């Protein structure tokens, strides 16, 4: 038995999310089907970050165990033959048996894309948040600084969170503008349920002028309520990178 790790890219627009559910299509169920077809085994996969319905990934990390021995290119090409066009295995690598895609991770990075224009985008409607009011990225950047470091992010989680601890450590949070696009780049040790989307929604409230910069600090201190924060839609959210200790070397 060997353990393999995959780098997986997907457009989550048409899926219920990562986790498999009855009677609906998920990223996990599609991957397990494709891997099982190639290996002629019943394959169970584990991911580094469970994405919600409509959320995308540029590099989701997935591991599984198998008895089949074949080349990395054979795995990649074989599995992709059984996957829909909006899911793709980018690379396959052997990994130490101690590795776990979720529990070995030391940080996750997400990017959120906002199309900030009075005229919405038809082509990218399921891949960005089309927002018509002008966003002041300088105000958003100042507000974002309050969120850096280790804090109790209870107010930024949605109902349904199963995490025992609500403390998280945000290492990096940047807000930049590229033409009509506003990008929010965030990395932390882990995230609570819908935490990124709730942070984005709150920063947008500051950027459009509905709330002052210091409102983010008020939110952070308000452990019990939401203070009318909004949740950004799933369409603009991308899982970009998951980091692991250096002794887990992947052959990409």
From Swiss-Prot:
Q: Name one Pfam family in it.
A: PseudoU_synth_1
The answer to keyword Nucleotide-binding applying to this record is: no
The entry's substrate-binding residues are 110
> Where are the annotated coiled coils located?
none
Could you give a single Gene Ontology term from the biological process aspect?
Answer: tRNA pseudouridine synthesis
- What catalytic reaction does the record list? uridine(38/39/40) in tRNA = pseudouridine(38/39/40) in tRNA
Give its E.C. classification number. Answer: 5.4.99.12
Q: Which PANTHER family match?
A: PSEUDOURIDYLATE SYNTHASE, TRNA PSEUDOURIDINE SYNTHASE-LIKE 1
For this chain, the family text in UniProt reads: Belongs to the tRNA pseudouridine synthase TruA family.
> How does the annotation summarize its subunit structure?
Homodimer.
Name of the protein in its database record: tRNA pseudouridine synthase A
